[in-house]
Amino acid sequence: KIAELTGLPFASADDLFDATQNLDGFVTVSSSLKTCAVNLSKLCNDLRLLSSGPRTGFAEITLPPKQNGSSIMPGKINPVIPEVVSQVAFNIIGNDCTITMAAEAGQLELNAFEPVVFYNLFESIETLTSAVQTLTDNCILGITANEKHCEELVDASVGISTALCPT
């Protein structure tokens, strides 16, 4: 009936005993969400590093300003959106640990820890979805390259010597 009502391909588990005893399918989904969160946090770390500056740091890109910068560092833009997305990722990683431990905690024919699995799984799905949307709308779409500074870095790079001395 759920498949008919939603139009989604819901079906009973092939092995109902296994589905009652083990929550490995939920662990797999959670692990995939964790992997996505880890990669998203890594991307945010890269954005924070590449936008560090203005006088020191990489300063290769500029993030859209979303919060007042520092009073002691004029021109600094705080990378608040990448920071909040990384914090969401940390929470999803923690949720994955909770889901893993809950799946492991079942005994014999029953796992009584499904409520915490579902709570954390749904939270991870919802917060990851929101974090991606927030990062896209409030950061990614507004990033600008600091072309002049990047050109200066290329001109000063010792990597240019490779082009002058082909092997």
Model-identified regions with their sequence ranges:
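Glycine-rich, mobile lid/loop segments that gate access to catalytic sites or pores
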Residues: 1-16
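Catalytic-core signal marking the mid-to-C-terminal active-site face
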Residues: 14, 18-22, 26, 45, ...
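Alpha-helical support elements that line or immediately flank enzyme active sites
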Residues: 30-42
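Structured DNA-binding interfaces in DNA transaction proteins
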Residues: 31, 49-52
